[in-house]
Amino acid sequence: KDIEPSADYAGEENTDDFILAIQTDKTKQTKESAWIVCADHVKEHSGSLNASTTDEAFIRTGTVTTKTGTQRTLAVNGNRCVGDAFQDFVLSHKIKYGTGKDVIVPYVYFSVRTGKGETGNASLVVTSDVGGSANAPATFAVDVKAVGTPKAFDYLTDVTA
């Protein structure tokens, strides 16, 4: 896209300005720059932050809500494309039917405008491996759900330094 991340960037960001990449091979992909980018035929990778809370009632204060945690979820969906490294991995039998640590992978999610984002581990939860109507492109959907709290990521210092 010919965009160079800049710590001084100010302005609008588009959905296309965000990169989601996962590590699919620990032996060959030792740096984030070698991880597989989620892009080809992907229509959406929407991020959401799902907070956990508890409510307690106190005398004279009333109900108080305490935030106890936050889980990052990236909802990915698009058209099926056999041969795309991201789709081939997330739609593999191992991931579709896997459980526990077998479906947990390192990920990075950041803005190409600022270079800032997050990195951590996430569970890959395939919610649809083939969808669509007659004569329409086949579709897929997968949720990328962070395990624990991701770390802050800065492309300018973590990758290019």
Language-model region placement:
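Secondary-structure transition/turn motif
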Residues: 41, 80, 145-148
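Extracellular/virion structural assembly segments
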Residues: 59-121, 151-161
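Mixed-charge, glycine-accented linear interaction segment located at domain edges/termini
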Residues: 119-161
